[in-house]
Swiss-Prot record:
Subunit structure, as described in the record: Component of the Mediator complex.
Species per Swiss-Prot/TrEMBL record: Emericella nidulans (strain FGSC A4 / ATCC 38163 / CBS 112.46 / NRRL 194 / M139) (Aspergillus nidulans)
GO terms of molecular function: transcription coregulator activity
The protein's name: Mediator of RNA polymerase II transcription subunit 7
Similarity remark: Belongs to the Mediator complex subunit 7 family.
């Protein structure tokens, strides 16, 4: 048996106890309350989308208030006891209390009023290479410290940690540029596919026009032939002559399609 007062640590926190209130009966009760509140002055029910604030303003029993969704967080939220920020802006290392080992991106000088020349961007690749070399050097120094004075490892481990954080921050600064380049490549590929489809349709159109022109020319020759044959067949009825003309035209079309 487990000792009283002993707690067990798990990888994920247990669900909050309010899940016990999410029963089919409670859900139906909440739905009935919403239907009653949506009635108009004439007593008819109106279809309405309820917001969390509107649901909280209704007279709901305490056991049903857990079924009302909370307000959507606008700035930050908490997950597993850790506060997360909804902002997509990458915070600087100084804001996180970490020593920055590379210079910050230069900002345009607004005081001088000379905004015609843009500021030169930071050479991220150069500083990434320097940090990588510093990591190799610090690792060799760390191995040397472990072989001579293992108890003095903490300062060197902190230096290596700081170098890794700076390298990752530089890589994260490349994310917007990577997203733009990926979008450009996708749009260029889509444009190339569209141009290829247009060229294929133009080619098919030219082939169809050529076939139609050839059919029109052959049809004119067939028409003159039919007129000459009708003069020789004055005793033949028009109803008997139509199938022969159609058969001759279909023979021409079949020969064209076989080619």
């Amino acid at each position: 048996m487990a000792e009283p007062g002993r707690t067990f640590n798990t990888a994920f926190a247990p669900p909050p106890p309010l899940w016990k209130h999410f029963t089919p009966e409670n859900l139906q009760r909440l739905e009935n309350i919403k239907k009653e509140a949506s009635k108009g002055e004439d007593g008819r029910r109106r279809k309405k989308e309820w917001s969390p604030a509107e649901l909280r303003s209704l007279k709901i029993p305490p056991e049903l208030r857990f079924l009302v969704p909370p307000e959507i967080p606008s700035e930050q939220y908490s997950i597993f006891g850790e506060v997360q920020n909804l902002s997509t802006a990458l915070p600087s290392l100084e804001e996180q209390g970490i020593t920055q080992l590379y210079p910050s991106s230069p900002k345009p000088d607004t005081k001088s009023g000379d905004s015609s020349q843009p500021a030169q961007p930071l050479n991220h690749a150069y500083y990434l290479l320097k940090i990588s070399k510093s990591l190799l050097l610090n690792f060799l120094e760390f191995v040397g410290i472990l072989s001579v004075a293992p108890e003095q490892f903490e300062p060197k481990v902190e230096d290596i940690r700081n170098l890794f954080i700076n390298a990752h921050h530089l890589l994260n600064l490349y994310r917007p540029h990577q997203a733009r380049e990926s979008l450009i490549m996708m749009m260029e590929a889509q444009l190339a596919r569209t141009k290829d489809e247009i060229q294929q349709m133009d080619k098919l159109k030219e082939e169809v026009n050529a076939v139609l022109d050839q059919l029109a020319a052959e049809g004119a020759d067939v028409g003159s032939t039919i007129q000459s044959t009708t003069k020789d067949k004055k005793g033949v009825k028009p109803e008997d002559q139509i199938p022969e003309d159609s058969k001759l035209l279909w023979d021409i079309l079949d020969g064209k399609l076989d080619d």
